[in-house]
Swiss-Prot record:
Region feature Disordered, mapped onto this chain: 1-31
GO terms for cellular component: cytosolic small ribosomal subunit
Species: Saccharolobus solfataricus (strain ATCC 35092 / DSM 1617 / JCM 11322 / P2)
Record-annotated disulphide pairs: none
Protein name: Small ribosomal subunit protein eS8
Organism phylogeny: Archaea, Thermoproteota, Thermoprotei, Sulfolobales, Sulfolobaceae
Gene that encodes the chain: rps8e
Length: 133
């Protein structure tokens, strides 16, 4: 079932607006993909407008972490999700989004990609935090 993202049929007062056209296919959206930690990586391939595809990351175990000091990237295991600036409930539920702070085998990192839309988790290692962990 799609999520309708078009204009609402209610006025501010609560009354119904007059319907001047039908719903369009391009106004249909999808529910959010909540990427969480799991034993294996599971990706969902969705068809989007124009026949293109969007790869959604549903479950993951690893992240591509860039070390700014050496300018090298490594694929490392994610240990836990520490915090999410957008919504603290997402971190509590273990959902990885862009901007989330994660603990990896390489140290603390911040997610820079959008896992629900890119199909991969890219992160940048935090400078002062990586020496502590």
């Amino acid at each position: 079932m799609g999520f309708y993202q078009g204009p609402d049929n209610r006025k501010i007062t609560g009354g119904l607006k007059g319907k001047h056209r039908d719903k369009r296919k391009y106004e249909i959206g999808n529910p959010p993909t909540f990427t969480t930690l799991s034993a294996e990586d599971i990706r969902i391939k969705d068809r989007t407008l124009g026949g293109n595809f969007k790869v959604r990351l549903k479950y993951t175990t690893t992240a591509n972490v860039l070390d700014p000091a050496t300018n090298t990237a490594k694929k490392v295991k994610i240990l836990e999700i520490l915090e999410t600036p957008a919504n603290k409930e997402l971190a509590r539920r273990g959902i990885i989004i862009r901007g989330a702070k994660i603990r990896t085998e390489a140290g603390l990192a911040v997610v820079t990609s959008r896992p629900g839309q890119d199909g991969v988790i890219n992160a940048v290692l935090l400078k002062n935090e990586s020496q502590r962990s």
